Amino acid sequence: MEGEGLKLAAKYSYVCEKARLLKFSNDLYDYFRHGKGEAERIEKILKNLLSYDFYRRIAQLNHKEPFDEEVVSFYWKGNPELKGEEWIHNASTLIPIIQIKMHQIVEELVDDCVVHPAKISDKISNREWWVIYQPITKTLKKDKLTLGPKVELIVQNELDLDLKEGDWVTVHFRKVIEKISQKEADKLLQLTKEALRNFNKKNKQKAR
């Protein structure tokens, strides 16, 4: 369903305003949260984001439309299983920094941009929760990006999801986006590890 795919794309994209990449954060939020705004206008906004190019690539490989819900879901969290794992968000978001020398890469910025699977560990308030996740960090030699040991992080539940301890969620820019299954969390973690391995190989070759 393209209508649901458009809402899902808006849901993951609205937080990119924090990275100063997006001027229409409130428009996207109002669309998927409150049904405000025209679908045609939201689609136009989303088509101007870098993620749309990867929706198209995934859609072509799988004979679907770019805003098909399965295409958008696969791009952001690697589920359901489709062709085009090299174009999912956690792989494609690393492309712009492939040629940057490792010591110049700020892993905290990469960590914010990546979509993380995380497990709810404790409640602070309805809008703030502790989660356990594996952050993007550098190896001891500072020559590769990797997933670090599990740590706790405070995240925002701006979407007022019904959360409880033990729930699995996706986190983007320290905001909870969706509740997911443990199977989906495991898959996203696996794909993120693969994306980092591929990035490190290319970065070593190009950033000289």
Task: Name each region found by the language model.
Residues E108-N126, I132:
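Structural detector for short beta-strands of small beta-barrel domains
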Residues L140-L161:
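Beta-strand/loop nucleic-acid-binding surfaces
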Residues K183-R208:
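Short peripheral tails and domain-boundary helices/loops at the edges of structured domains
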Residues D167-W168:
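Structural motif
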